[in-house]
C-alpha cells in the first residue's frame, strides 16, 4: 500500500517518499485501530494492488465529549463513535497512474458507499487538500463540495 502511495503522489511538488521506518511506524500505530470495513483495496488480475482508499469514523464528537482525554471514561465515547457514527473522515486514496481515469475511482466510491450505508454514515469530511492537486479536486466536483480546508505550499530560493 505504501509503495502505491509513493507511486500515486510522486508528481506532487511537495511529496516526499515514505521511508521504511515511517512505514513501520504507521503500521504499528494505526493499522490495529482501523476498522477493516473502512479500507477499500482493488487488485488487478495478477493480485497486484492498483488502488486503495482509507476512511474512518469521525472521532471529533468523541474528542469533544471526553474533553480530549481517554481516561478515566473518555474511551467510552471513542468506542461508541467506532460503533455508531453518522460521520466519517476520508483520509487517503491512492490509484496507480496506469489505472487513473479508467473508472477505478467509481469502483472505490461504490464500495465506500456500501460501507457507509451499512454503518449509517451520512456525512463525509476530507483532509486538507493541496491546491495544486487537481486530480483530488476533480474527484469531488460532482458532490457539490464545500472547501473549507486547503493546503498551499510556498517556496523561496535562497
Enumerate the predicted regions with their spans:
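A conserved beta-strand-loop-helix scaffold within acyl/acetyltransferase catalytic domains
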Residues: 1-94
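Conserved catalytic-core motifs of GNAT/GCN5-like acyltransferases
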Residues: 127, 144-158
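Acyl-donor (CoA/ACP) binding surface of acyl/acetyltransferases
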Residues: 118, 134, 158
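Conserved acetyl-CoA-binding loop-helix of GNAT-fold acetyltransferases
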Residues: 73, 87-95, 100-116, 142
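Conserved GNAT acetyl-CoA-binding A-motif
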Residues: 87-88, 116-130
Amino acid at each position: 500500500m505504501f509503495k502505491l502511495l509513493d507511486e500515486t503522489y510522486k508528481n506532487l511538488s511537495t511529496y516526499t517518499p515514505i521511508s521504511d521506518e515511517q512505514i513501520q511506524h504507521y503500521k504499528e500505530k494505526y493499522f490495529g485501530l482501523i476498522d477493516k470495513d473502512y479500507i477499500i483495496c482493488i487488485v488487478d488480475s495478477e493480485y497486484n494492488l492498483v488502488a486503495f482508499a482509507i476512511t474512518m469514523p469521525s472521532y471529533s464528537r468523541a474528542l469533544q465529549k471526553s474533553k480530549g482525554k481517554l481516561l478515566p471514561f473518555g474511551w467510552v465515547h471513542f468506542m461508541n463513535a467506532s460503533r455508531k457514527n453518522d460521520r466519517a473522515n476520508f483520509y487517503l486514496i491512492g490509484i496507480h497512474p496506469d489505472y487513473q481515469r479508467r473508472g477505478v475511482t467509481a469502483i472505490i466510491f461504490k464500495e465506500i458507499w456500501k460501507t457507509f450505508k451499512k454503518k449509517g454514515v451520512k456525512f463525509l469530511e476530507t483532509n486538507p487538500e493541496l491546491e495544486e492537486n487537481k486530480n483530488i479536486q476533480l474527484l469531488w466536483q460532482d458532490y457539490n463540495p464545500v472547501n473549507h480546508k486547503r493546503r498551499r505550499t510556498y517556496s523561496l530560493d535562497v
